[in-house]
Amino acid sequence: MVLIKSRKSIVTATNVCINSSSKFYLTEEQVQSLGDKEFLTASYRRFLRMRQFISKRQMVKESYTTYLRYKFKIEDFELKRSKLLSVSGMSAMDFRSSVQKSLCFLIKAFSISDAYSKDMIDDSHKCKKIIKNLLTVDYHRNRIINRSSNMYQYYRKDFTFFTDGQNIGLKQFEENLMRLNECLGTRL
């Protein structure tokens, strides 16, 4: 077994132990006190720091980075939400708390300890599977978009694939993801 020690972490062949986890969490004070732009920048930075835990494969890391860039810079979450859910199905979502819960969801997916109970370990594995499925669907969507330039508007801006009869599987995936977001209070 190879053991690498640094000021910030201890790396083995199978695990990474972080000495200071404060760089990965948003404190309640930061959530409340930062302006919108500073909050988004701080959140984006923390999500990007989680990149090393997503996968060892470079392609998956790049897919995660592309997904984050889209989520933070381009996506109109409220438009997507209003097109997918009926008005009665929508609950009031606080932007800051939903971003914070999304970060906690991601941290839960990639953290594990000997002190965890079986339920906590199962929870962690479920979170990891959800993240992997999100990245897989996003990767395939990006491959379709890269083949044809007018597909970007179709999939990323207008969300017209929600209403036409094509791409039913992707529409159902997006609906289920939005319902999961509603239940957990996240913005995945």
Curated annotation (Swiss-Prot):
Keyword terms: Sporulation
Family, similarity comment: Belongs to the IRC19 family.
Record protein name field: Increased recombination centers protein 19
Superkingdom: Eukaryota
Any single biological process term in GO: ascospore formation
Species, as recorded: Kluyveromyces lactis (strain ATCC 8585 / CBS 2359 / DSM 70799 / NBRC 1267 / NRRL Y-1140 / WM37) (Yeast)
Protein function: Involved in sporulation and maintenance of the mitochondrial DNA. Is probably involved in a pathway contributing to genomic integrity.
